């Protein structure tokens, strides 16, 4: 419990907790917590401390305190409703957690109120803590008061206060002042069993000292705070009537019944050691529901969900004045007859201390002696039904099993003979049978899904949709209705002895409640064969979607639609007696028999498959037959089998055969028929219900979620909870009568659980772990079902903390799918004993696969080429030429490889020659300007340009002279008809016309260039691949002009041409060709 306490403290003192989330959680908790113990016959003895704690009226808020309580506590003023309770300083004692671990200290800063402030009447004022207190409580707008324990104790340095009520509401007596009495006290709630829960789980603390850390119970789901007092402390019940005769109740329409007068115990009674009273105040603002009556429950402690509850103390033998809360002075108190009193108000509380088994909690009603409970608000989330928990021995740390969002617990007596007078002693535990759930408002859409004829869809406990035949569904319902009425233990609906409880809850807006969609369940009562006491079991129910109301008790409607969930609770499951071991041993034997059958049939199939000879197959069959008939034993069988099949010995085979052969010989009387059946067809898969056993152990660690508004599920588990999810509806069975239900082999530790994939509608907070121990229900018959195909509907939002769950679910689903495909069917245990049948049969799988893959087995080991060899030269002319040359040397025949070799040699020679010629030709394009090692000595190109310019100038000068002569001749006015003169004139006119035409052409060109725009010159600063010594190869081709927008400008590709001079240069430099005939022929060309 120490580890769980630390985890709870970590959640509670996390500074990142959103105030609104916590407020909503408290609102949801209070709507689901009802005043427990209001429907018992007896009141346990009350102490003055209890009366003082209950006398202080607390408003609608829970005040949180530091785990190390305040050092000094001022005395509580006497409450108005309890005149006889004198205030006394609290007892000093060292605070320690319930499990004995170190408690994490809280921050010294003032805490925020954990409940939203609502309009509530100021019932009392909160006194600030005195000097030296470790943590201060922040006042809340609604009235709140905490009363200190009245037992005196010597002062100690910085020790927490004694047990004080976390929150208590007490209505005053029928005096003139109808308001609750002011009970000022130190501002630090403390109690020995107070536990911090923030998330809808139930916590059970065991206190070895009189004082424990003061903590708050904040919950969004139904939960109960069950503190276990010191073993020597007598049981105490505090049941305060909520606002009996209050001045201004927050529920507007519900009137307050008058307070019930009850004689109070004398104030001088010596106070026994204080137990752990804890009270939860409910914030106002939720409407009241229809009133119903509450059943009387024989177990010693109970906490029920619900809305407002009204309770008044029963009359005790002692005489006294009227008090709002009165206790009974002695342990042997008389029983109070229940009477129907109804009060429908929103505020409610749970004040409960779990006593030793010798005393019984009871509750009293507001109208004189009344034991009735009205629990009415509507529900908008998931509502788990109460789960019964037998109390462990005092002094042992115990954890409560965690439900969907936390379970309201009922402490059922495991020793019914120890009940006091007036309580009917019965061995039958309380049977809670919920009604059928109403369909949710938002049904799940399943698109493109065709249901086979005769099948129906039901929703399982995990939120999955399962396909079940209609006949099976009808059998489930008929079986559920056909159970005997004595096993149902129905409670009469009349409010005389055991009125039913109607439980509803209101979810605050924005409160995240983890909704699991399941169908209602019934209870499997399991009887311990080695013990006389009945192990009480209860149902863990999660309602689907939005379910308005759920009736517990009354006429139990056991006909259901889907799978039933039975949660085995109570003491750790190691106490389940010897039937478990025998059943599990039988199951293991059957599993071994099945695997041995598969092994032998596979052996026969492999031997007779054609790979082996017929003689080997016959010998293997004879060996198997002799083994089944008992003629030979396992050692002889395996040795002869190894010799027959030439296989390596298997060390696990002999022990496996020894374990499974006796049962196999009993189940297989006819060995010849078994061998024949193995040869004909593979063994049919055994029909198994794959959803029979789902071990879902709720993790004890705190699952932290990423978002602030996501709800978390935490609980401190001591015994693991095994949830037996069954594909059939299981009715309530008789005690001692085995319940018909489908049983699978329990998963051994370390094996893979193969349940259907867990699909949750909210953040998946359930961790799949291996159970520490196994529960087997002995069954006279087994219902064989076809494997149900789960249809997952909601894809869970996987958070960082749930990757392991997703991985386990995926692996389980894949393994289950593979197992169902196998001919022998899937088992829940790894086949580690015998898993290599092929090697035992002498089949080498690697050789077989190699033979299958090798299409041409004759080519194995030879050189294979991926492509056909192609010759460079034509085969026929080359062969003819080679034969012509060979005739001179006496060669008449030629191998085809010779032609190929000569062709390849020719190709290689030409390739080398072309490479050399290319290198030679590239040297002509080598630019020495770019090399820094060279300087330009002469510019031949510039000299040539200069000579060209000289020639051009000379020609221009001659043209000018001729033109000048022509112009002079044209201008002459001589009248002589000289033919030479006429010729010159004509030539001058043509020259002028030609000049005019040239001028027009030049003007037109300039105009066109101006219209086109300036030319973009190529940049030469970044040389491309074609510049320099490159460009001769045929592979690199770069376009001559560069694009306009390209960032890199390429220069024009320079093409290197290889000419005959380059070839001659190469032939001259080679030794082989420097004096060859080919070189001289090249010179001649």
Curated annotation (Swiss-Prot):
Chain positions found as Phosphoserine: 109
GO biological process, one term: positive regulation of transcription initiation by RNA polymerase II
Pfam families per record: TAF4, TAFH
GO MF: aryl hydrocarbon receptor binding; DNA binding; protein heterodimerization activity
Keyword Nucleus: yes
Main location: nucleus
Location in the cell: Nucleus
Region feature (Minimal region required to interact with TAF12): 870-913
InterPro entries the UniProt entry points to: Histone-fold, TAF4, TAF4_C, TAFH/NHR1_dom_sf, TAFH_NHR1
Recorded GO CC terms: chromatin; cytosol; male germ cell nucleus; MLL1 complex; nucleoplasm; nucleus; protein-containing complex; transcription factor TFIID complex
Modified residues (Asymmetric dimethylarginine): 424, 435
Low complexity bias (residue ranges): 66-85, 132-150, 158-171, 191-204, 302-320, 331-341, 396-407, 1035-1047
Family recorded in the similarity comment: Belongs to the TAF4 family.
Purpose: The TFIID basal transcription factor complex plays a major role in the initiation of RNA polymerase II (Pol II)-dependent transcription. TFIID recognizes and binds promoters with or without a TATA box via its subunit TBP, a TATA-box-binding protein, and promotes assembly of the pre-initiation complex (PIC). The TFIID complex consists of TBP and TBP-associated factors (TAFs), including TAF1, TAF2, TAF3, TAF4, TAF5, TAF6, TAF7, TAF8, TAF9, TAF10, TAF11, TAF12 and TAF13.
The protein's name: Transcription initiation factor TFIID subunit 4
Lineage of the species this protein comes from: Eukaryota, Metazoa, Chordata, Craniata, Vertebrata
Gene from which this protein is expressed: TAF4
């Amino acid at each position: 419990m120490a580890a769980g306490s630390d985890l709870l403290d970590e959640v509670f003192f996390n500074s990142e907790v959103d105030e609104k989330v916590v407020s909503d959680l408290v609102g949801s908790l209070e709507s689901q917590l009802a005043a427990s113990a209001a429907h018992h016959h007896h009141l346990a003895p009350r102490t003055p401390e209890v009366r003082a704690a209950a006398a202080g009226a607390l408003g609608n808020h829970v005040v949180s305190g530091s785990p190390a309580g305040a050092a000094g506590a001022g005395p509580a003023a006497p409450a108005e409703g309890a005149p006889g309770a004198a205030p006394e300083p609290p007892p000093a004692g060292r605070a320690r957690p319930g499990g004995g671990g170190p408690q994490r200290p809280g921050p010294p800063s003032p805490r925020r109120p954990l409940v939203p402030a609502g309009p509530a009447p100021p019932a009392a004022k909160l006194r600030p803590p005195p000097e030296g207190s470790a943590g201060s409580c922040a006042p809340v707008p609604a009235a709140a008061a905490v009363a200190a324990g009245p037992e005196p104790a010597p002062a100690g340095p910085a020790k927490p206060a004694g047990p004080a009520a976390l929150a208590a509401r007490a209505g005053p007596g029928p005096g003139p002042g109808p308001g609750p009495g002011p009970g000022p006290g130190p501002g630090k709630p403390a109690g020995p069993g107070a536990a911090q829960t923030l998330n809808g789980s139930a916590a059970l603390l065991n206190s070895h000292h009189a004082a424990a850390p003061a903590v708050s119970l904040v919950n969004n789901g139904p939960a109960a705070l069950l503190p276990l007092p010191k073993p020597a402390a007598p049981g105490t019940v505090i049941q305060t009537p909520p606002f009996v005769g209050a001045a201004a109740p927050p529920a507007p329409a519900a009137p307050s019944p008058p307070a019930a007068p009850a004689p109070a115990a004398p104030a001088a009674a010596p106070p026994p050691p204080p137990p752990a009273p804890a009270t939860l105040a409910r914030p106002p603002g939720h409407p009241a529901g229809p009133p119903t009556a509450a059943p009387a429950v024989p177990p010693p402690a109970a906490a029920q969900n619900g809305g407002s509850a009204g309770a008044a103390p029963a009359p005790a033998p002692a005489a006294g004045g009227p008090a709002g809360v009165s206790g009974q002075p002695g342990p042997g108190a008389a029983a109070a007859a229940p009477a129907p009193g109804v009060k429908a108000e929103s505020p409610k509380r749970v004040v409960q201390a779990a006593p030793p088994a010798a005393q019984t909690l009871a509750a009293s009603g507001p109208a004189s002696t009344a034991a009735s409970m009205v629990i009415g608000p509507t529900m908008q989330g998931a509502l788990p039904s109460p789960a019964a928990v037998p109390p462990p021995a005092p002094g042992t740390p115990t954890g409560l099993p965690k439900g969907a969002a936390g379970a309201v617990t009922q402490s059922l007596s495991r020793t019914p003979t120890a009940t006091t007078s007036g309580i009917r002693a019965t061995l039958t535990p309380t049977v809670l049978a919920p009604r059928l759930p109403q369909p949710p408002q938002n049904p799940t859409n399943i698109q493109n899904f065709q249901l086979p004829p005769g099948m129906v869809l039901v929703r399982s406990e995990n939120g999955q949709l399962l396909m079940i035949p209609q006949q099976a569904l009808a059998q489930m319902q008929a079986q559920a209705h056909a159970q005997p009425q004595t096993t149902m233990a129905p409670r009469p609906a009349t409010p005389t002895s055991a009125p039913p409880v109607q439980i509803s809850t209101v979810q605050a807006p924005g409160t995240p409640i983890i909704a699991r969609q399941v169908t209602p369940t019934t209870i499997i009562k399991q009887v311990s064969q080695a013990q006389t006491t009945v192990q009480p079991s209860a149902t863990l129910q999660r309602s689907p979607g939005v379910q308005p109301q759920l009736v517990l008790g009354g006429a139990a409607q056991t006909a259901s639609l889907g799978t039933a969930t039975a949660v085995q609770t109570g003491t750790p499951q190691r106490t389940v007696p010897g039937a478990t071991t025998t059943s599990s041993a039988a199951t293991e034997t059957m599993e071994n028999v099945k695997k041995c059958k598969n092994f032998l049939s596979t052996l026969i199939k492999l031997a007779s498959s054609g790979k082996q000879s017929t003689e080997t197959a016959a010998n293997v069959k004879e060996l198997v037959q002799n083994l089944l008939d008992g003629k030979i034993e396992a050692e002889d069988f395996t040795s002869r089998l190894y010799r027959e099949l030439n296989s390596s010995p298997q060390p696990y085979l002999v022990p496996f055969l020894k374990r499974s052969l006796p049962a196999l010989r009993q189940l297989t009387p006819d060995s010849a028929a078994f061998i024949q059946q193995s040869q004909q067809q593979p063994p049919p898969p055994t029909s198994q219900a794959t959803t029979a056993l789902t071990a879902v152990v709720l993790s004890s660690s705190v699952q932290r979620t990423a978002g602030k508004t996501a709800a978390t599920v935490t609980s401190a588990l001591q015994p693991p909870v095994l949830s037996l999810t069954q594909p059939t509806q299981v009715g309530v069975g008789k005690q001692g009568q085995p319940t018909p239900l489908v049983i699978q082999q329990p998963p051994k530790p370390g094996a893979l659980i193969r349940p259907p994939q867990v699909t949750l509608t909210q953040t998946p907070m359930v961790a799949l772990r291996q159970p520490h121990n196994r529960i087997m229900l002995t069954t006279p018959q087994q219902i064989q079902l076809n494997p149900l195909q789960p249809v997952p509907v909601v894809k869970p939002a996987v958070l960082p903390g749930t990757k392991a769950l997703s991985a386990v679910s995926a692996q389980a689903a894949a393994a289950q799918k593979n197992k169902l495909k196998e001919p022998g069917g899937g088992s829940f245990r790894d086949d580690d004993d015998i898993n290599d049948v092929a090697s035992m049969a002498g089949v080498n799988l690697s050789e077989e696969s190699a033979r299958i893959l090798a299409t041409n087995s004759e080519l194995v080991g030879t050189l294979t080429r991926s492509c056909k060899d192609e010759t460079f030269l034509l085969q026929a002319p080359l062969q003819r030429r080679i034969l012509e040359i060979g005739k001179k040397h006496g060669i008449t025949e030629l191998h085809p490889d010779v032609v190929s070799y000569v062709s390849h040699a020719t190709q290689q020679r030409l390739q080398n020659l072309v490479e050399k010629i290319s290198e030679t030709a590239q040297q002509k394009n080598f630019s020495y300007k770019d090399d820094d090692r060279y300087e330009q000595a002469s510019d031949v190109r510039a000299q040539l340009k200069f000579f060209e310019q000289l020639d051009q100038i000379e020609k221009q000068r001659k043209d000018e002279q001729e033109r000048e002569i022509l112009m002079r001749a044209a201008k002459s006015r001589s009248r002589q008809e000289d033919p030479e003169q006429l010729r010159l004139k004509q030539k001058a006119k043509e020259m002028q016309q030609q000049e005019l035409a040239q001028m027009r052409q030049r003007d037109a060109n300039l105009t066109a260039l101006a219209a086109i725009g300036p030319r973009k010159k190529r940049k030469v600063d970044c040389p491309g691949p074609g510049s320099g010594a490159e460009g001769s190869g045929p592979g690199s081709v770069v376009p001559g002009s560069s694009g306009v927008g390209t960032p890199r400008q390429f220069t024009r590709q320079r093409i290197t041409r290889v000419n005959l001079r380059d070839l001659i240069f190469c032939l001259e430099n080679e030794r082989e060709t420097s004096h060859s005939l080919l070189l001289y022929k090249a010179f001649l060309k």
